Structure formats: structure tokens, C-alpha cells
């Protein structure tokens, strides 16, 4: 659930099928605010401050009107104390435990039976239709229709099944593409609960009257979703405008009962359904654990704080502050963000902003989340990504977060390298490192399936390849074979697919892979991690030959990334070359350095030859007016292209904003090392031998000119 002030409707809350209202009242005049005088008398006015590691406040024009009284940011110690108090209020927050929910709901058989009949009544008819389709051979024909029916059934069954369907929409190893597409459309769409209950919950959770905390609050929720609803309010002590999210009464009880029943179905599937190879019970428990974390709003606040610390250093990214002293396990108070949904193209463009710029910011931030720090926003739907009036991209709603293990981050980048190289055997082996397959699974049958799909997909260039097409194709492979896609990877696919979908509103030709490639190129060129260094070597060398076109393309793409550094690109490569264990690579580099040096020298000769008057060419080059070298036309063109390619690569390095001749100083220091001097000597020796051979050929051509082909 997320907040935004819409450009056309006034106050708008964006999210999953949320209701819209825009009225406001004074707290003191509302019939809902019954002030507990005894509690008010003993309660001091709490000076809640957002957490920001002690940095000075930097009010955002998009979220802090000039009329708002600016608050003084607390120092780190006070801030940690405020967070500790919030944690204390959440000390009794429930943690998902299959044993505890079984003990609790197993002792309430009539309640469990009533809900079971409700679920069976909804899903039983659907299962019967599937059985008839299978018997009549109409499964494929009716798949889209059945997927729509399942989405509607999940919506009717309430929050747990809406969340379950959203989770299934990220699992290509469990659901066919038609079901993935339909379940991804599931939206939270529950009616609001009474405002009196919400206000009572705030007072109960924070142990303060509303009048003490707020000077005004909307009398009705700005939005309502499955787990809670949100009010817009103004803090009394500072005038700060905030969003206050209040948890739906009884939601934890309802979700616990549903997961108790769903686990029972999972046990039956694991025991009796052979064609589903995934451990369904483990999958259910992982998902239930994630939903229970969303029920703890202090956990969500900590997620927001961590996210802000990692990613809000960029000028074009906004993460709202948390007000810890007004936050508990059922109440979350955070900075109000004004903005426009990212799929409202006309509203965004009317402010002089470009949707594609904002989406590209989202893609670059998401790539950093997924592959640098590993802590990422797992629910980037349009309501959680807002365009602020000053052009920033605001991230909201941090209930659903996930983490990418460090080894998986590098494995994903390596997987991209294997894809570019069309090395399908290596791609299949990557699935072990990514934990998609258990070590005892033979990947041999999977390789042809990867080849069949990607050979067709890679007929397009990276800039032409549609990410959703790629995901759908991979999903078909995952569905056919015994894959168990980890939750983090499924959420990665969903995040990037959503971002590409948002971009397609503005530009039907936009491709998220093309926008992502500069980041991958920069990481390959600059990251000193040994795994990525090996991946770079694998990308650039083939059959003992260096692929200069690959390096040129990487530099072209990497230089588009705002964080690209020529210094970072040069030094790790040199260190790799001079590593005591790098003899095999040095042999390849020596061979290539000889080729390049020869190409530069011979290119200079050709340029000199071409600049001479025609009568001098015959005099200088042994009476031959057709060319200076004993080389075929194809060989000469290849040599000159190599020289020009190296020249362009050097130009790309020089054009980097971070390029400074001073970066060569540490490189020269590296070259003073004994191994570097030996390497240089071997290169010089190789160049000398090649040029001597060329010179000897030239002399022989002078005595037997007919034996040498004309260039």
C-alpha cells in the first residue's frame, strides 16, 4: 500500500485497488477523537524524529511545503533510542511458526471447518473444470480462461489468497505463462474498516491520544488495502505532514488460519502429486514468513531506513523518513510524499518530466539493489514508484523486501556473460550456483531447451530483446524441468518486468535489457571480484584470441553508466595480468600485445606510404608502387581495423569523465614490478620477431617480386 497526492484528483493513494478520498478535519472537532484526559495528563509530548544517521535535515521541496515548521534532526544516539522504543512496542509481534499456528487453529475445529468449506466451495469448482479440460484435451485451449477464473477466485477469498496469488505470479517454475500473467494482475481491494477502530488502534499502540500526536488528520482513510489502511495527518509538534498506516483488525488471525489450512493442502500435494517436483510445503512456509513480516510495521520501518541508507545517496531517488516514536507493530508513521503514479504519463509530462527518465532511474537503482548490495524492493508496482514534482523517483511501501545472496549476485552477472557467449552448457551449470537445481540433477537434457529458445531470442540484439519475452521463455524451460527458483530470483524477474511494463506506457520500443547493459558492462570492467574477472576474461577471449570488438562494446556501454571510471577499468586488469598465477592469461595477452604493436607499426608504415607522392613510393618500397607490405588485401584490412579499434578503445577511455593522465601514475608504478618488466620484455621480443620477419619478406620480394601477392 502506497501514498501519493494525485495531480488530477487532489489527494490520491496509489496501490492495489485502493479507495480515494480527500477530506480533512481538525482532530479536536472530530467525533472520532475521544481524548483520554488521564492518559493525556501523564503523557509528555513526544518529539519524534526521522532516522538519518545524524545528518543535517535537507527538506525536499516535493514533500515539505515552505509553511511547514522545519524540525531539527536528532543526533544518532537520540535516533537510536527512538528506534529502540519502537522495537519495544513491537516486542509481542508475531513470528510465523507452523507449529504455533497448528496448535492454535487445530484447537478451533469448527472455525477451521467453516473456512475450509468456504475455500473448497470456491476452489472445488475450479478444480473440477480443470479435470474436465484435461479429460477432453482442452487444457491448452482453455488455459487463459481458467487463469482469469483463478484470479477472480483468489480475489473473493480475501487477503491471504490475494497475497498467495501475487506470490505465485513470480514463480515460473510452478505456473504456466498464462497463469503468471493473470495472477500478476491481482490487486488488494478490500473495503475500509471503521475509522473509530483505526483511531482506537493508534491510541492503544502508541499510548497517546490522537490530539496529543496530531493537529489534524483525515476523517476517513486515504486508501485501504488487504493488510491495513492509511490516513493523512499533520504532526502537532512540528507541522510535518505524514502518512499513518494502521493495520486491519483481526488480519493476523485470518491469515494464520488460512496458512494453517493451506499447509494441509501442501502436505497432500507433496505426498500424492508426482508431477510437481518443487517442495510445496517449503514454498508455503517461505511465503507465509514473508507475509508475517509485512504484518510487523516496525520491521517495515527498519526496511525503509536500511533502504534509504543504501540507495538514497543518489540525487534523483527519494525515500521517505520514518517517525519512530509514532511507529509500532500495527501503526507506521512516515513522511508524506507528493507525487504521481509512474503509469500516469500525461500527468507526469504536464509537469515537464519524462517517464522514461524516471523509469531509467528505477532500473539503475534496481540493478544496484539486486547486484551490488543485495537488499531490494520486491514490489515496485506503479503505486510504489512515484514521480515527485521536482523529478525524483520516490520509493514507497517497504513491507515486501528481499535479499540476493552475495554468491548469487556474481553468478547472475556470470550468467549474462554465458548468455552473450551462447555458452549453453555453462548457462545450465550456472543453475547449480544459483541454487535453481540440486547437485544431483543432470543438466544434459536442459541444454537443448536453452539452445532452442535462446538461439531464436538472440537473433535480436540486446537493444531489441524484450525482457518479458526472455522471462516467458525461461519460464517455459523452468516449468518443464525440475527447477526450484529461489524467491529472490523470482522477485528480481518480477521487478524488472514491472519496470519494463511501466516504460512501455511511454515508449512501446523501450527494452529494459538495453537500459541495463551499461550497468553490467561497468561491473565487468571495474569490479575486482575474482569471479567477475574470470567472467570478463571468458567474454573477451575465445580460442586463444582476444575479441577487441567485445571490449570496445563493453567500454561504449559501460561509459553510459554514470559511475563508470576509466581508472577503475584499467587497474584491476593490470593487477590480474601481473598475478603470480596468471601465466596462462599472460601468454594470451603477450600474443595479443604483439599483434596490436605490429598493427600499430604496420599501420604507420601504410599511412606513410599513402602520404607519399606516387613516384616516391616506387623508389622507397623496392620499386613497388602498389603497396609497402607483402600482405594480402584481407590481411592488411584486418591489421588496419585492429589498429583503428585499439585507437577507438583508447579514445573511449580518454572520454571518460573521470579520465585524468594522473591515473597512469599508479599504472606506471605497477609496470615497475619485476613481473611487469618481464612481460614487457616478452612483448617487445615478440614484436621484434614479427617485424623482422616482415622485413625479411620485404627483402625477398625485392629479389622475387612475382612471388608476393599484391595488397
Swiss-Prot record:
Q: Please list the residues that make up the active site.
A: 379
Organism domain of life: Eukaryota
**Transit peptide as UniProt keyword:** yes
In the record, the effect of residue 405 to S is given as: In rbd1-12; suppression of bdr1-1 and bdr1-2 bleaching and dwarf phenotypes
| Class of enzymatic activity (EC top level) | transferase
One GO term describing the cellular component: plastoglobule
The residues listed in the UniProt record as binding ATP, with positions renumbered to this chain, are: 222-230, 245
The Swiss-Prot or TrEMBL record annotates one GO molecular function as: protein serine kinase activity
EC assignment? 2.7.-.-, 2.7.11.1
Q: How does it assemble?
A: Interacts with ABC1K1 in plastoglobules (PG). Interacts with PGM48.
Q: What does this protein do?
A: Kinase that can phosphorylate the tocopherol cyclase VTE1, a key enzyme of tocopherol (vitamin E) metabolism and involved in the recycling of oxidated alpha-tocopherol quinone, possibly stabilizing it at plastoglobules. Also regulates membrane prenylquinone composition. Required for photooxidative stress responses to prevent photosystem II core and chlorophyll degradations. Together with ABC1K1, contributes to plastoglobule (PG) function in prenyl-lipid metabolism, stress response, and thylakoid remodeling.
* Name recorded for this polypeptide: Protein ACTIVITY OF BC1 COMPLEX KINASE 3, chloroplastic
What is the originating organism of this protein?
Arabidopsis thaliana
Question: What gene makes this protein?
Answer: ABC1K3
